[in-house]
């Protein structure tokens, strides 16, 4: 493979990882964006609404280490694909939530999207030499 071809592949992987991270980040904030509507529709208390908003944030933070480890073991492409599928499904079914419990469950899965940063860092680093990783990672996240 030529250097030019390898650079093109690396750039394409960077774009795909960045777009995936952006979409995951949007899904990660989905619950908080719609929290006022959920509160009104389901009659949630302030405390319940706060818990609903906190679940994805906390899970995203806690899941970064395991997601990073999975990325090291199985590769970013597989882990990102599985995560993206789970998050997309959770985001698609959020409107079907009929109870606070269902929303918490969906928020849990959306919280996994917060760990996408750790996946992308390992994935992007793999495609770039050390001299270019700072720039690539700066563009990624």
Model-derived features: where do they sit?
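Residue-level signature of mid-helix packing/kink "hotspots" within the transmembrane helices
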Residues: 29, 57-65, 115
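Helical-face signature of the major facilitator-like transporter fold
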Residues: 20-21, 25, 91, 99-111
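Hydrophobic/aromatic and small-residue hotspots that mark the transmembrane alpha-helices
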Residues: 35, 63-71, 121-124, 133
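Cytoplasmic helix-loop-helix junction between adjacent transmembrane helices
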Residues: 106-141
């Amino acid at each position: 493979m030529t250097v030019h071809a390898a650079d093109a592949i690396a750039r394409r992987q960077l774009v795909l990882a960045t777009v995936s991270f952006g979409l995951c980040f949007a899904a990660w904030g989905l619950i908080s964006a719609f929290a006022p509507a959920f509160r009104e529709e389901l009659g949630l208390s302030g405390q319940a609404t706060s818990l609903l908003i906190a679940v994805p944030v906390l899970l995203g933070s806690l899941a970064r280490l395991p997601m990073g480890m999975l990325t090291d073991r199985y590769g970013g492409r597989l882990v990102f694909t599985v995560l993206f599928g789970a998050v997309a499904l959770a985001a698609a079914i959020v409107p079907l939530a009929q109870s606070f419990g269902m929303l918490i469950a969906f928020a849990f899965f959306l919280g996994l999207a917060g760990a996408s940063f750790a996946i992308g860092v390992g994935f992007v680093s793999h495609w770039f030499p050390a001299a270019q990783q700072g720039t690539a990672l700066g563009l990624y996240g």
